[in-house]
Amino acid sequence: MRGHKPTLKEYVLDLYPEPTDLYCYEQLSDSSDEDEGLDRPDGQAQPATADYYIVTCCHTCNTTVRLCVNSTASDLRTIQQLLMGTVNIVCPTCAQQ
């Protein structure tokens, strides 16, 4: 295009930039809430934990025993190694005998 007027009607020459609101409407929490996850003396956060369900058999009567634990993945591996080794779980009925 080399003239003062466009030759094609599709060109829109009267567009202006639209202002964008750069204000962040996020509510900031109190700074004391951020320190709740920092329970270690060195200021590191607690490792992530999750709920795990363990289903095993009673050592005495072989009934199904279900455990629910909240642990880190590495600590759950330790529990698994203990259960595969010498630690045995008994049901509440056998525990009272």
Swiss-Prot record:
Superkingdom as given in the UniProt entry: Viruses
PTM note: Highly phosphorylated.
Sorted UniProt keywords: Activator, DNA-binding, Early protein, G1/S host cell cycle checkpoint dysregulation by virus, Host cytoplasm, Host nucleus, Host-virus interaction, Inhibition of host innate immune response by virus, Inhibition of host interferon signaling pathway by virus, Interferon antiviral system evasion, Metal-binding, Modulation of host cell cycle by virus, Oncogene, Transcription, Transcription regulation, Viral immunoevasion, Zinc, Zinc-finger
One GO term describing the cellular component: host cell nucleus
Localization per record: Host cytoplasm; Host nucleus
Record-linked SUPFAM superfamilies: E7 C-terminal domain-like (SSF161234)
E7 terminal domain: region residues: 1-40
Motif (Nuclear export signal): 76-84
One record GO biological process: symbiont-mediated suppression of host type I interferon-mediated signaling pathway
Annotated S-S bridges: none
LXCXE motif, short sequence motif: residues: 22-26
Main location: host cell
Alphabetized Pfam families for the sequence: E7
GO molecular function: DNA binding; DNA-binding transcription factor activity; protein domain specific binding; zinc ion binding
UniProt zinc finger (unnamed) residues: 58-94
Domain characteristics, as noted in the entry: The E7 terminal domain is an intrinsically disordered domain, whose flexibility and conformational transitions confer target adaptability to the oncoprotein. It allows adaptation to a variety of protein targets and exposes the PEST degradation sequence that regulates its turnover in the cell.
Reported function: Plays a role in viral genome replication by driving entry of quiescent cells into the cell cycle. Stimulation of progression from G1 to S phase allows the virus to efficiently use the cellular DNA replicating machinery to achieve viral genome replication. E7 protein has both transforming and trans-activating activities. Induces the disassembly of the E2F1 transcription factor from RB1, with subsequent transcriptional activation of E2F1-regulated S-phase genes. Interferes with host histone deacetylation mediated by HDAC1 and HDAC2, leading to transcription activation.
Subunit structure: Homodimer. Homooligomer. Interacts with host RB1; this interaction induces dissociation of RB1-E2F1 complex thereby disrupting RB1 activity. Interacts with host EP300; this interaction represses EP300 transcriptional activity. Interacts with protein E2; this interaction inhibits E7 oncogenic activity. Interacts with host TMEM173/STING; this interaction impairs the ability of TMEM173/STING to sense cytosolic DNA and promote the production of type I interferon (IFN-alpha and IFN-beta).
Protein name, entry field: Protein E7
